[in-house]
Amino acid sequence: ALILGQEFSKRTINLEVSAGHSRKQIFTSKIISYLIAFNLMALVYPVSGCIREFGRFGVADVGMFFYNIIKAIIYSCLLNSAIFLIAILICCYLQDVVKATSVTAIIIFGLSLYLGYGMMLRLPVGFLPTYQIRIVVSMKTFFQPIAILVGCIWSGILVLLSWIKFCKCDFK
């Protein structure tokens, strides 16, 4: 939210439009580059934690260890991207770095609170991508259709809404 908000605030996107790039090119490049950067940053901590614990406790089955790491990486990228796209949507609507960062933080904090208390109070939490990550890493099977569906629905809706708003933004 911070970086994309700065691009709106500092009118970087306006310069890209003025340079002759289409909105589709700009939007697609922003989404792809930010999702790659976000997922790389989001995976550093879990992967380093696995390596640290591997060194400390060892692993009984190396194949299963790497199977679980690959599964966690793939599903984390899909489901964390769905959460990160909230920031993209908010930035497209607010077009201000401070407002977008604040609103995004509040929304994600609210979703985290709902996940924590929702699980305790037995509220429906299966629609949350963060909950699906928890389910996927605790299951033995690799293919988790519900997690894939949740990630794709969240991502699809958020990208569509972001694109619609991005097309309506006034760039001069």
Which positions does each model-derived feature cover?
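Hydrophobic/aromatic residues in alpha-helical transmembrane segments
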Residues: 1, 13, 85-86, 129, ...
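Secretory targeting signals
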Residues: 1-3, 27-98, 134-149
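Helix-loop-helix units of permease transmembrane domains in multi-pass membrane transporters
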Residues: 3-35
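Helix-loop interface residues and adjacent transmembrane-helix termini in multi-pass membrane transporters
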Residues: 7, 20, 93-94, 160
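Membrane-interfacial segments
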Residues: 8, 12, 52-60, 94, ...
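Terminal transmembrane helical anchor/hairpin motif
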Residues: 60, 101-172
